[in-house]
Amino acid sequence: MSPQTETKASVGFQAGVKDYKLTYYTPEYETKDTDILAAFRVTPQPGVPPEEAGAAVAAESSTGTWTTVWTDGLTSLDRYKGRCYHIEPVAGEDNQWICYVAYPLDLFEEGSVTNMFTSIVGNVFGFKALRALRLEDLRIPPAYTKTFQGPPHGIQVERDKLNKYGRPLLGCTIKPKLGLSAKNYGRACYECLRGGLDFTKDDENVNSQPFMRWRDRFVFCAEAIYKAQAETGEIKGHYLNATAGTCEEMIKRAVFARELGVPIVMHDYITGGFTANTSLAHYCRDNGLLLHIHRAMHAVIDRQKNHGMHFRVLAKALRMSGGDHIHSGTVVGKLEGEREMTLGFVDLLRDDFIEKDRARGIFFTQDWVSMPGVIPVASGGIHVWHMPALTEIFGDDSVLQFGGGTLGHPWGNAPGAAANRVALEACVQARNEGRDLAREGNEIIREACKWSPELAAACEVWKAIKFEFEPVDTIDE
């Protein structure tokens, strides 16, 4: 060993392994306005103290690795490291803690959800010292928010484009989701739109399969839109799914949709990826297309309470990446979603400023600094009897989407659409008159049945349909 090497080793670098908490657990740290803050639900392995587990999360999701490295001396760890600054036990759990981590903003590329998630929810989730790890919430600082375009248009611009105000929008997913020819698919869209719906929708797994290639579907759906608009005098739309195997193909499909003059396209943002989604959102803003977002694959990530990532984080990420609608659960339908928790992330999608509210699962105050809002879409196992509850829970700035609840009507698609439209208009009118939708909902629907045979038939078919299962993911007591 040369004398120069000996001198450097003796003065600075000390090889070996040391506890993460010696560097990354800093309870005295005062968070900065520019920090990205994260709340992790941490379940350590037996024998691992929570301080070490929380520090390990901060280290492995920022600058740290399993051993000391000499290149630490070539940068400022104090400037760039993540810090576990607070730990609190989870009520009712013996071995779970909420660990709060602050990340300096310089760790992340501007305008890139992909880069943000690669660090914060990257390899650390496979760390052996942790039995389980879940990201519960993120605080995105205004300094980072302003590097994102966000939704292509937002709620108010969509209202203005559609010229529809004062009520939720109505949609329908075309069923069966796979197997129809393009012409029959377009016919189903036309019947639903003519019957009174605002939108019809491709299901998330409708891309370009042998039974129905994307270009044929786009053409027949555009024909359905224009025909229904001419007959009803209302602006109509169909969520044309542009999701594809490559970004180039996805943009090609969006370009064709724009050439057809339709108002909206669709993307599966988790399976498609955040880079693809952000690219499509930029194209949609530049070319006047609304963007509907489906969350296929979300439950793989967010359903288990002790591991993965809560949907409120995926919802925030979508607002940053870009989308005008996103599926959010229904509370009352067939899919997972507790009421207060769902309303918490619905507010995070729509509102400009959201206060911390642990009772609704919101760990941090979030200021979106005028980033456009996203319309939540309630979809999955809902029908006309749910209309009062959906109107009361989600309010006007929402899309209520009835697939089977439209196409399953005994008289056909158009009567199914009419039944939903009548039920919605009745609920909105009753609410505007001061009636209590939660208490009087069934009575309101029965009254409307007297002057709508389509609604009466729908009510008879689905009068006994319920999905009464306890949610897996609940708010901590």
Swiss-Prot record:
Mg(2+) binds at residues 201, 203-204. Residues 1-2 form a propeptide. Its main location: plastid. The keyword Oxidoreductase applies. Keywords: Acetylation, Calvin cycle, Carbon dioxide fixation, Chloroplast, Disulfide bond, Lyase, Magnesium, Metal-binding, Monooxygenase, Oxidoreductase, Photorespiration, Photosynthesis, Plastid. Its cofactor is Mg(2+). Its EC number is 4.1.1.39. The disulfide bond which can form in the large chain dimeric partners within the hexadecamer appears to be associated with oxidative stress and protein turnover. One of its GO terms (biological process) is photorespiration. PROSITE patterns: RUBISCO_LARGE. The record marks 334 as: Transition state stabilizer. The modification N6-carboxylysine is found at residue 201. It is found in: Plastid, Chloroplast. The active site is at residues 175, 294. It catalyses: 2 (2R)-3-phosphoglycerate + 2 H(+) = D-ribulose 1,5-bisphosphate + CO2 + H2O; D-ribulose 1,5-bisphosphate + O2 = 2-phosphoglycolate + (2R)-3-phosphoglycerate + 2 H(+). One of its GO terms (cellular component) is chloroplast. Gene3D superfamilies: Ribulose bisphosphate carboxylase, large subunit, C-terminal domain (3.20.20.110), RuBisCO large subunit, N-terminal domain (3.30.70.150). NCBIfam families: PRK04208.1. Belongs to the RuBisCO large chain family. Type I subfamily. RuBisCO catalyzes two reactions: the carboxylation of D-ribulose 1,5-bisphosphate, the primary event in carbon dioxide fixation, as well as the oxidative fragmentation of the pentose substrate in the photorespiration process. Both reactions occur simultaneously and in competition at the same active site. The basic functional RuBisCO is composed of a large chain homodimer in a 'head-to-tail' conformation. In form I RuBisCO this homodimer is arranged in a barrel-like tetramer with the small subunits forming a tetrameric 'cap' on each end of the 'barrel'. This is Ribulose bisphosphate carboxylase large chain. It comes from Avena sativa (Oat).
